[in-house]
Amino acid sequence: MLHSQIKSDIKQCYENLGNQLDNFIPRRAQNYLVAEIAKTLAGEYHQKHRMLVGEAGTGIGKSLAYLLGGIPFALFNNKKLLISTATVALQEQLINKDLPLFNRIYPKEFSFILAKGRQRYCCNHKLEACCATNNDQQVTLWEEKPKKSDLDLLRRMLKATRDGKWDGDRDSWPTTIPDRVWPQIMADKHSCHAGLPQHRSCPFAKAREHLDKADVIIANHALLMADIELGGGVILPEPEQTIYVIDEAHHLPKVARDFSSAASSLKGAATWLEKLNQTIGKLAELAEYKKAARFQDAILENIQHLIPTLRQVANNVDVGMFSKDGIYRFEHGELPAWLEQEAKGCKDASKKALQSLGKIHDLISERLKDNEIQQRLGEQALAESGVYLQRLENLEKVWALMAQPKKDKGAPLARWIEKNPDNEGDYIIQVSPLEVGYRLDQLLWSRAAGAILVSATLRALNQFTYFCRQVGIYEMDSTRFLALASPFDYQNNARLVIPALSLEPQADKFTDLLIKTLPEYLEGETASLVLFSSYWQMNKVADELRPLAKKNKWELLVQGEESRHITLKKHKDNCKSGKPSILFGTGSFSEGLDLPGDLLKNLIITKIPFGVPTSPVEEAHAEYIESCGGNPFMQISVPEASKKLIQSVGRLIRKEDDMGRVVLLDRRIINRRYGKALLDSLPPFKRVIEYS
């Protein structure tokens, strides 16, 4: 049961909220979501499995709901609350708006912090080494001789660090730090960690101390996945001590799959292995040769197996088997016998080399800690060995996945070879799981103190089934499911118009039909957004309509012609000055674009956003479903299109008093068997269907 003190704290928050915000009106759906989150975390639905999956439509106020339902419970039970998001925009909203507001209304003290990965911080010792007056020392840390402007920038950064005016966070430096500069000073787990006394004052170590003390932590999905891939509790708090709120949860499956994937070049890897071959003697000397000799021998032996093998694999690749995109995918993830054999050898050799280099790295670290070697030499050696450790870790992951035997149950791995665009004659080996749900369940859901997954779009075709399968949540395992409709009056404030068209989007002449049809639905409109399925089609239509736009004094703004920020600013300025403004955009404009009020009155969607399985992972997934007797179009394409279409129409109504219309120029929503399910999953617009 939910403790009376937690109930009291939540009630007090609501009372204080009324005092803090003018015209605050409690929303029934938000109140219900708060109560369900609190009851789920308290174990009222299941004592051990404390999970809620909630789709909360636009306007409900889900972020305030999970703060109200989650923070009082977490603090009362001495747990951390970790909020994971997919976008920087939501992180900024939470840090700069929602959490400061909650801090004012919550009757008790609590602290919150934005967590970032180690690579967002500089290492003080690397920064000092780069600024050293010894030119030889400077240059050895750079792949190319540094520019004077780069060294001047580094010296300013060092001074700001020493003066306490910069915390070492890349994002907080007032100007953009060039990508050629940042890797020289970036913290890494091998050479910059709190185990070395001289690094305990480095920016990441300090940030980690603050994170350990914080009650509420904001992170992104990538950092969350990085932590659980390491076993949990390494970068972020232990899962058993953490209540997770996964906002924008519909992005989690892709992020999780990307983190479980791996890629490595063949000849490129052989090249850096040769460099390791040349430098390992120097590292072994610093590690104390007597102790390091056997590890050095093991590294040399395994490198000398890897280098010719990787080159031989590259030479054995048949260039005639690649698609026009430079990709060859192994059907059903099955490798030819010769490559399967080489994969096993590469897996074993890279694993042994990694273990042995790790031992040498640890020996150098110990000697540095005991002041047995010069700090400058030790730091430089750790940085160098750290780079090779990271490369070997990746190499071992790639070949371990390539060598993994076929499972009796479940989806196979997607495996493919890609031409290296940066190095002619070289190839990149790539491996990715098709399904990551089991891994998420094993590493996160089964260990978490509680988990709340929310988004405005989680269901496909009005069901949670597709999302649950993606993230490893089983609908019969006592998880609490909620689908809360938006409070907006769609029926009276918005129309969904489906014009009678003669062609479907896949027809050859459909682009010509768009050019002919669009002006009818742009005429007389002040603020329009037209969403296309491809850049090619968008640009073709834009080019054909420019003369008409000029004649009618429409301002036509096309995605990609200028930065997103400038394009949207021009659109907003046009709307404010009363000039008809038309935005042309592709898929990225269908999510996360906020154009409330007079900034959008007319949304035109040129086609149902079906994705064609073109990537190796998508092709492999479709192939697997077919092999199981399923239908990839109905099991993947239609659910994905449903989610994307909901996101697209969601651009129109952003606030309670917004009004406008959606025009869908795709007749398939009327005349195909899946059309009704897609249509019924949309918000309850007033429908104007021009088909008899």
Curated annotation (Swiss-Prot):
Gene: dinG
Domain Helicase ATP-binding, residue spans: 16-293
Reported cofactor(s): [4Fe-4S] cluster
Swiss-Prot/TrEMBL catalytic activity: Couples ATP hydrolysis with the unwinding of duplex DNA at the replication fork by translocating in the 5'-3' direction. This creates two antiparallel DNA single strands (ssDNA). The leading ssDNA polymer is the template for DNA polymerase III holoenzyme which synthesizes a continuous strand; ATP + H2O = ADP + phosphate + H(+)
NCBIfam families hit by this protein: PRK11747.1
Binding site for ATP: 56-63
Organism: Photobacterium profundum (strain SS9)
Protein name according to UniProt: ATP-dependent DNA helicase DinG
TM region(s), chain numbering: none
Tagged with keyword Cell inner membrane: no
GO biological process, one term: SOS response
Keywords associated with the record: 4Fe-4S, ATP-binding, DNA-binding, Helicase, Hydrolase, Iron, Iron-sulfur, Isomerase, Metal-binding, Nucleotide-binding
Amino-acid positions noted as binding [4Fe-4S] cluster in the UniProt annotation, renumbered to this chain: 123, 192, 202
Family designation: Belongs to the helicase family. DinG subfamily. Type 1 sub-subfamily.
Superkingdom of source: Bacteria
